[in-house]
């Protein structure tokens, strides 16, 4: 055998050893990777063993391949023509040549391995490692790229950001890998390679706020590699602290996010920002871009301010019912606060000592994900309370020693703590133990006024115009998102928030929302709570008569407990809260005394509500309610106690206009109903005209409750038709089966007997249709929509039950259109009829006797009397002298629909005009209506509102006369409901009855000479 031949075999042997060592290193790296995943709670012991088993098989395969290759190299027959005589000099020369060849082989392998051009003895090992890495990741990013592309992969990068690459290859742990080939139309070898970081949700419990994808594009080989994994712990935050020199990427994320927070989230305290960057685990800076990082800082700050304002018992209740990431966030942000906050974090952490996920305790997982500085803080506080909390083994807050609870409650007044300790010592075997424990628990859970307002949002923004303005804008935005309309209410709330910003310690406010049922008073209260970020508690007062329900029973009573006010404050868990008292005008009296109003007067007095007392505590405890925003809702302010009403800032909630109702139905109600019933909203077509038709013909309300019920009734019936292929679904079936024989299915829509469901028989069309088509129609997996028509509305809701009062058919003497408004904000016309009275005796001394019918109440009756006097006085003396002869028994005044009570002064000018018409015997234009209170002088006075004009147009009225003093109300309605004044409805503004009765558009063929000349002359002068 020649030396030359031995040299070639040595080269092959060296190359084999090199490859063997390379794959051995990769397998060992994968072994370490599996151990790291197990240690970091990414995989359990079973999955780790599966990976180890696969790696063990790879080692066995690799040894087998190596032995086979060695045998093949050294068992080959030597070349007989080779010379056996080689000098030492030639050996050195040849060794140099072999070495060069060996290096070139390795170089070729590194460059061309990407296309598998070199036959690698261990290629099967390589492929198995790549396959294993797809679902389990790899030791490092660069190890995998070296395996997949070749060790000389860096030479293939085209201007890649190597600093960022070097950073992430040192800290990022891949958990799964996907490889995509760049499509031909996007290939460009001159294009710069990129490395992109994107945050992703964690897929396992052990990883909290450190998961992301690292995507690397390599344009030279048309490949994109996506690594999904997590950033390994840098608990010292060394990378972040040295980022100014070490990493431009991290330094940019840190500084840019801080800038964005200051500009976009000015309410975030600068001290918190600085503390946050120092204490937070730097993993979050690796996985977030600057915008995302700024959002996270704001989110954590809002959580921090929320937690520091709550009492500890409330925090515990929320904490133990949260998921692991939320628990981590609670502890993480509390550790950044004051000593009291850190103490609370330690208490929460100890609650998790015995709680596990799999074989790992939640406390270990949370501790592992904290930064080093927070770990030290947590360790210190745990050691300081270890002896006191050593016996805690459950998650119930009741088992925490009461002394420790009191120590953690820095906001609780000292006299309250003394009271609790005193009552706690009294708890012995006896019948009052339950009440004593209730008294203690109530005080422990009550949200006392914070002693330190430094963490209060308003204190932190009050001196910055930008922060204050942005906060107000944010409140307004949240209100608009929560509540539709009600602009005046929102303005009042903005003013209140403005007061709180300038004086964070100022008292709350008492707001009264007055309006008809169903217009969103409760929703507005919820919107206030959401916009301010404070809790809402609701107290229903309807039918309540006993003040003890609100302020508690005396402790000595059997079954005594504290009242609803204290109970709702405990439920809210925050000194700043919204307390909503619903149906205030529906409370009941007790022994001719309204105890409820007396209690409400007490809690709304700003001088007294700081010392509110509950009878259950025998006047020993003062509860501070000064931070509560009290909101009352009622339908009418007339029923409220004047003293209580005087303390309320009243906001009138107007009924929704037709346009608003349609918008609410289309954008909210139908969407919600479709979701609840199981329809795709896009597949249900209920046009605005149909919604308007349902509103006008089937509902009589200020809000949208009945409208929602009617729409729900329609959709529920449509849903039943879906099961039986009836109605609109039958029509779709006919459309998709035009050639299929069908029958008349109309009877199924009319059928309402329960037997139709029991004895149902499919139609001939359904029997002859393709089942696949039927299922597609059933699931609305088609291009067509279900269109709700008037015909379907009639079938589902029956014929309309409401009728609109229309104007009389002809112009008549003594008959005029008055206007009415209901308690629900609806309006319309009410015909007023004045005729000669044929009952009575003109000689009985009761000249011009008035007979009033139609269920007219006291105020309306007085208005009729005033109208008659005014009508007579405006006529000339000649006509006056003939009235008694013409109407010997006076007048009969009637308002049709006697079953409906009618009251109020707003028909005064209508009565007057009708009297004038009856006396003169001249007809009144049937297309005219009017409203306004009449005075004896003929002046028309202001009425309560103009909502009664809303029904005039529907009734056929073309012209409405209103009082000049109501011009502002007219402008509001015109702005809110411009559609009312379209298509020819004219509004005339008047000040005196003369302007109406002398108008030929009102009384036909009227002659100005019929009236008192002096009165006409005086009116013209004033005009």
From Swiss-Prot:
The active site is at residue 906. The keyword ATP-binding applies. ATP binds at residues 515-522. GO terms for biological process: chaperone-mediated protein complex assembly; mitochondrion organization; protein quality control for misfolded or incompletely synthesized proteins. SUPFAM superfamilies: P-loop containing nucleoside triphosphate hydrolases, Ribosomal protein S5 domain 2-like. It is an enzyme of class 3 (hydrolase). One of its GO terms (molecular function) is single-stranded DNA binding. Residues 810-1003 form the Lon proteolytic domain. Disulfide bonds: none annotated. Its EC number is 3.4.21.-. Keywords: ATP-binding, Hydrolase, Nucleotide-binding, Protease, Serine protease. Pfam families: AAA, Lon_C, Lon_lid. Belongs to the peptidase S16 family. This is Lon protease homolog. It comes from Acanthamoeba polyphaga mimivirus (APMV). The lineage of its organism: Viruses, Varidnaviria, Bamfordvirae, Nucleocytoviricota, Megaviricetes.
